[in-house]
Amino acid sequence: MGASIAVTADGRDEWIEARETLHAHGSVLVHGRLPDWRPQAADNETLSTAVGGGRTGRRQLAHAAARERRAASHLLLGHAVAVALCTDVAEIELTRGPTGRPAVRGCDQIDISLSHTADLLLVGLTTRGLIGVDAEPADRRLRAAGLERRVCTVRERGDLDALPPRERASGLLRLWTLKESYTKAIGQGQRFPFDAFGFGPEGEPVRVHRPDGTPATGSEWSFRSDIRYVHGVAFRMSAAVRDVGLGRTTDIDVATTLDAGIVSTVQEALDGWE
C-alpha cells in the first residue's frame, strides 16, 4: 500500500495517479484539505448554526465544525469513488452497511473508509476486500488518565516504556491509529476492546498480535502507518487492508462490470413480460 496521494476537487493528474494506483495494487489512499473540499452551499448554514454566546455558542461552533468536516469528507469520498468507477459523482450514492461502515449503494466491488481530523480528510479504497483508515495530528497527546491500560496490551505497554520519554506519545498515537484502522475495517470500531489485540513496535513488520504478543493474523492483512506533512502540518495516517482471497478486481468501471450475457438474458426476460 503506497503513501496517500494529495487531491483537490479540480485536480486531474493526481486523480489519474490515484486510479492507476488502485488498478495496479488494489488499494489506494487519498487525502485532501478541508478548505479545498468544503461544500459551498453549506458555508452560510454552518456559520449561522454556530452563532451563539458563552458555553452554548462554543458547543454549537464545535458541532458545526464537526458537521462541516463530515460533509467535506463525504464529498471527497464521493469524488474518489466516482474516479475509481469511471462515473459521475452525481451517480454515487453513499450509504452505511449493517455495522455502520460506509459503503457505495449497489456497488460491492469496492470497499471504502474515511477519517477526518482538523483540516485533514483521508479516504481509503480497495478492491481486495476490506479497508479501514484513521488520521490524527502528529502532535496530538492522548492524555486521559489510565488510557494506555485501556487501549494497549501488556506487551505494547512494555514496548512504549522502552522508548525514550519524548517518543512515547508518538508511539501511542501510532498504535491508536492502527487500532482504529483495523477495527474500522472489520466493522467494529471502538466497540472492539483495544486492549484485546496489539501491534509490535515501529520498525517491525506490522501484524495484529494477541495480548501476549503472538501473531493473530497472517499475510491476508496489510498495514501502513506514517507521518505525512500537509501544507506544513504533520499528521499520522494509518490504514489496514484485508485481502479476502477472491483475487483482485481489475475492472470496476460502472459501464463494464455487468456481464454482457447476463444483461442480455435479463433484458430478454423483461421483454417477455411486455
Model-predicted regions and their roles:
Residues 1-274:
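Core catalytic alpha/beta fold that binds nucleotide/phospho-ligands
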